[in-house]
Amino acid sequence: MGAALALLGDLVATVSEAAAATGFSVAEIAAGEAAATIEVEIASLATVEGITSTSEAIAAIGLTPETYAVITGAPGAVAGFAALVQTVTGGSAIAQLGYRFFADWDHKVSTVGLFQQPAMALQLFNPEDYYDILFPGVNAFVNNIHYLDPRHWGPSLFSTISQAFWNLVRDDLPALTSQEIQRRTQKLFVESLARFLEETTWAIVNSPANLYNYISDYYSRLSPVRPSMVRQVAQREGTYISFGHSYTQSIDDADSIQEVTQRLDLKTPNVQSGEFIERSIAPGGANQRSAPQWMLPLLLGLYGTVTPALEAYEDGPNKKKRRKEGPRASSKTSYKRRSRSSRS
């Protein structure tokens, strides 16, 4: 076994020197790929340049006879070493492993199909949202972090922020400015109107009531006879008829408005108007805003903060009309028997 290991060491050293001299890898030399490549080059030289001697072709390629011998004899040496080891130890598995060590130096063969289904894929299939299912939100984080280049995060960050700021100034700022101006104008108008209503002086005016009373009294005194006929009768009898007022004397010969006012006698005196409402100040000296109770719904309506309790106070509770229910007809049949007379 020691001799086999010594031969293995010499073989590895020789193949390594040949690989360093030619540029081929150890795996290519052991597998025979390097020898096949050299044979193709020698054949091409013989075809193109007419070189028939192998030594001249090897010299033209730039190889020495020793190196050429090592490259062409390496696959056989590996096979012979495997046979020697198998003969000495009786372990064919070790020879197979040694052959694979040189033959498959850079190429790995998957053994999945040897133990599972032969037509199985060599790579597991994962859906696009596989990692997002395992870690929710990781895809969104990865997609967003690509906007900042880790290698040049400074210029990328500056470019991204400046572009976002420019988009805001160009697209969103005019709309936001107009909305803000509209909102502030509306708020200023409502605030000014509310302050005006709070600080102004209010007075009780009964002119509409006096006018309504005058019109009501006028129409209540009208005669069912047409006014033209009433005037004709009054002129014939020498009396004065007033539609809505009673005169103590004629006002046709009055000299001034004061005299007309003195002669005019109204049965329903006017209600005095012009009484000012005293404005109350908030107690405590904090100069808080205050308003009378009858003005509170108006102010709250301007600010848009009318509460349901205030609506119920102003409009009254919403009373639902109960449905009038008549006597329900009994679904059960009366099984009471009539009282029979004892007479036959």
From Swiss-Prot:
Keywords: Capsid protein, DNA-binding, Host endoplasmic reticulum, Host membrane, Host nucleus, Host-virus interaction, Ion channel, Ion transport, Late protein, Lipoprotein, Membrane, Myristate, Transmembrane, Transmembrane helix, Transport, Viral attachment to host cell, Viral ion channel, Viral penetration into host cytoplasm, Viral penetration into host nucleus, Viral penetration via permeabilization of host membrane, Viral release from host cell, Virion, Virus entry into host cell. A lipid is attached at residue 2 (N-myristoyl glycine). GO terms for molecular function: channel activity; DNA binding; structural molecule activity. It comes from the Viruses. Pfam families: Polyoma_coat2. One of its GO terms (cellular component) is host cell. The chain crosses the membrane at residues 290-310. Residues 313-344 are annotated as: DNA-binding. One of its GO terms (biological process) is viral penetration into host nucleus. A motif (Nuclear localization signal) lies at residues 316-324. Residues 312-344 are annotated as: Disordered. InterPro entries: Polyoma_coat_VP2 (IPR001070). Residues 273-308 are annotated as: D1. Residues 334-344 have a biased composition (Basic residues). Belongs to the polyomaviruses capsid protein VP2 family. This is Minor capsid protein VP2. It comes from JC polyomavirus. The lineage of its organism: Viruses, Monodnaviria, Shotokuvirae, Cossaviricota, Papovaviricetes.
